[in-house]
Amino acid sequence: FINGKTVSVKRDNPDDKAHFGKEVSLKIYDRMEIAAGQSRYQIVQQPIFPGKSKMLNDRRGDLMLLINGMPVFHLELKRSGVPVSQAYNQIEKYAHEGVFTGLFSLVQIFVAMNPEETVYFANPGPDGKFNTDYYFHWADFNNEPINDWKEIASKLLSIPMAHQLIGFYTVADDADGVLKVMRSYQYYAASAISDVVSKTKWDSGKQRGGDIWHSSGKTMTSFKSAQLIANSNDADKVVFLTDRIELGTQSLKEYRAFADENETVQATDNTYELITKLKSIATADTLIVTSIQKMSNIRDEEGGKNARDIELIGKKRLVFIVDEAHRSTFGDMLAIIKETFPRVIFFGFTGTPVFEENAKKNNAQTDVFGNELHRYSIADGIRDKNVLGFDPYKVLTFRDKDVRQAVALEKAKATTVADALNDPAKAAVYYKYMDNTQVKMYGEPGPDGKWIKGIEDYLPNTQYLTAEHKQTVIEDIKENWLTLSHNGKFHAIFATSSI
């Protein structure tokens, strides 16, 4: 309703004889008119919700944010020291009492906050179920949670972000009938992709897309990326490429559930149908789901009779979004597609990227797609409880003290500790790497997002090829197998960098 831009209303006041029975079109909301056009923003303090029965008193909220007079954000605030759970429990209580009905049913996003913590979540509707698994903390580009209320106000609840969140980053999922709002990392990825496409010089011959490394939520993010591109008219076609029929069927079902009422996501039963939809100028054929096999067949089918079609399609601005990119990039099919359509821009989504040390024939993620646009690794997902966690334990093949000393000697260009300490220049370097306050054991991102190396970052992978390390791994498995497998009840996966 809100993203429908306009709504028709028939006047029904019989006393207004001049207009009775006539229809008028009311402009309610335009997702593109951000801080511009006819958009108006207002803040309501302490809105009063009439009680739904004589047994219930009127309820008083804390804040509402209005766009064009419609309440789209509802905020419940608590003072310092009061857990934020009390704020969202109060929202749930109001919802169960029927407060958010009528005009107030237009609330899209709830925000529960105290000065030190904020969570936001989509309105599940009058029949929906509140689920804390979908209560999110906003974070910065590097996935560091933002909780200070001043930063939340300026980065999440301000214009343009609040307008964009309602217009572009919520999804009315037809699959379960529940409104969904995107997490911060999904927003950063989708907006980064849209930004790259908007700045692309299509005839430069140097256009590159990018790589998204996300451990969860990839399907919604990839769809929203495509939707942003289509709505901006920055590309003629956005094609979702999968490398398996099962993935394609699943993706098509999910994309269609995410689509707005006026959007169509096209399937392709064969290569001929794919060619037809790629050539089409119909708006309904903008978003297409197909397989990498069908796309690569366009060049080879019918002995080159597709030349004219390829020429027509090649003139279009094409964006290809590759699902599970770590699988699809191997082999010759992606190379064939790039050769057939040299103007195309590729974006890859994966939770397990292919790094340079594991790549074959320039098939690392950055070689195929371009620079990494955003990262939400499994470590971020475990911290935020968006993916299943691990129960790790560490078995030391080498003592941390010995590893640190070996790195310190190497950096000091010394063979022994005595050799390092007898030379002032070498000693300064040696002490730097021996000092945990200057060089930590493990690397971590700095304030600017750049990686600060730790001792382990200076170690070569060859240490894991030594007989000493291999023997320690084998002994640990043997000694603990009965306990960890619950006497053989469970199997195990052995992960290694090389066989």
Describe the residue ranges of each PLM region.
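Conserved motor-coupling elements within RecA-like helicase/translocase cores
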Residues: 271-288, 312
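Structural recognition of the conserved hydrophobic beta-strand(s) that form the central parallel beta-sheet
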Residues: 110-112, 288-291, 320, 345-350
